[in-house]
């Protein structure tokens, strides 16, 4: 049962990245007046906001694919879920750090909660060796 819940969690965490995809493509606003990823400290000045939004969109889809694939790996009882989820968590955290606007206001709009979840996933999987299962 814990593997099923863990797999569902990873799939849902991946799907939340698609909300940030929609935000970055301007398909909808997650919150009124939310402009993420415009003003990203690592890309906006260099590439402009339009290209930054495209890069953020692609990155969010890749992170989503990683988490969904990891969840599917758990459901299918495949050992490869572990490196896939670790890679997705690291990639996702790096994405949100790079697309952060550099300000300390509205951190939750900048992906701070996703970063905290990714850190928790990394601690659980790499340090605590959770979930401890044999396939």
Residue ranges and their predicted role:
Residues 1-135:
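Membrane-interface extramembranous regions
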């Amino acid at each position: 049962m814990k593997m099923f819940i863990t797999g569902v969690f990873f799939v849902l965490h991946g799907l939340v990245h698609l909300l940030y995809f929609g935000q970055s493509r301007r398909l909808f606003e997650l919150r009124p007046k939310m402009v993420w990823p415009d003003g990203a400290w690592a890309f906006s000045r260099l590439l402009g906001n339009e290209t930054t939004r495209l890069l953020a969109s692609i990155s969010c889809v890749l992170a989503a694919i990683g988490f969904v694939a990891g969840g599917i790996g758990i459901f299918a009882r495949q050992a490869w879920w572990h490196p896939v989820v670790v890679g997705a968590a690291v990639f996702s955290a790096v994405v949100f750090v790079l697309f952060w606007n550099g300000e300390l206001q509205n951190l939750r709009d900048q992906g701070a909660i996703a970063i905290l979840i990714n850190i928790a996933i990394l601690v659980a999987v790499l340090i605590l060796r959770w979930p401890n299962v044999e396939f």
